[in-house]
Regions:
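Domain-level detector of nuclease and nuclease-like folds
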Residues: 66-192
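Short, His- and charge-rich active-site/binding loops that engage polyanionic ligands
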Residues: 23-82
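Structured catalytic/translocation cores of nucleotide/phosphate-coupled proteins
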Residues: 18-20, 25, 35-36, 104, ...
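Hydrophobic h-region of N-terminal signal peptides that target proteins for export
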Residues: 5-18
Length: 192
């Protein structure tokens, strides 16, 4: 009986501690598929809500989620990886609450700092410009190629990103390798 109880305990413990590869999350401002194994999102969808918002982000920092194993601040220390918002803070800065929701690690990718602060940031500004006159829907597909590196802290570094922007009857697709870009001109990364 003791062996059965111990076996049952070990089975339940293993089952409960198993990390999930694809957890679907829906928040009021974005949806995502998150991998606890990679400790990174695999896909994120959102509609730009505040193209002209101005709520300040002072004092806000990323936070973990109690029900999903995510990356955390240790993954971003002393390296070239920024805490890249998938659903950008500036697209949701109409209120403190919408802005705060963008700071979840569920919405955060290990993104090369020069990409995040360059061409990617300028593409986000372009989304907001479009959203001033039409509905803008965005999907980000995060690529983890066969050579995707895993940090000693546990998170996997994406190898690339596809960003699809839908507005009016148009669709634009951009592809960015997760590295320092050759140019900040985001139009050079348009693939469709």
């Amino acid at each position: 009986m003791k062996n059965f109880t111990l076996s049952l305990f070990l089975f339940v413990t293993t089952l409960l501690s198993a990390q999930r590869d694809s957890v679907f999350i829906k928040t009021p401002i974005y949806s995502c598929v998150y991998s606890e194994i990679l400790q990174q999102p695999k896909r994120v969808w959102y509609t730009v809500q505040c193209p002209s918002g101005s709520y300040p982000r002072k004092g806000m920092d990323f936070y973990t989620n109690d029900s999903v194993k995510t990356s955390d601040g240790k993954d971003y220390e002393a390296n070239v990886w920024d805490k890249g918002h998938c659903a950008p803070a500036a697209d949701f800065n109409c209120t403190r609450e919408t802005l705060w929701q963008t700071f979840s690690y569920l919405n955060c990718i290990l993104q090369h700092e020069k990409l995040n602060r360059g061409a990617w940031r300028l593409l986000e500004a372009y989304e907001r410009e479009l959203a001033k006159t039409t509905k803008v829907e965005v999907e980000i597909r995060v690529v983890y190629g066969p050579k995707a590196a895993k940090l000693p802290t546990g998170a996997t570094i994406p190898t690339a990103f596809y960003k699809t922007i839908k507005f009016g009857n148009k669709k634009e697709v951009y592809y960015f390798a997760n590295e320092a870009p050759a140019t900040t001109d985001f139009t050079k990364y348009k693939v469709q």
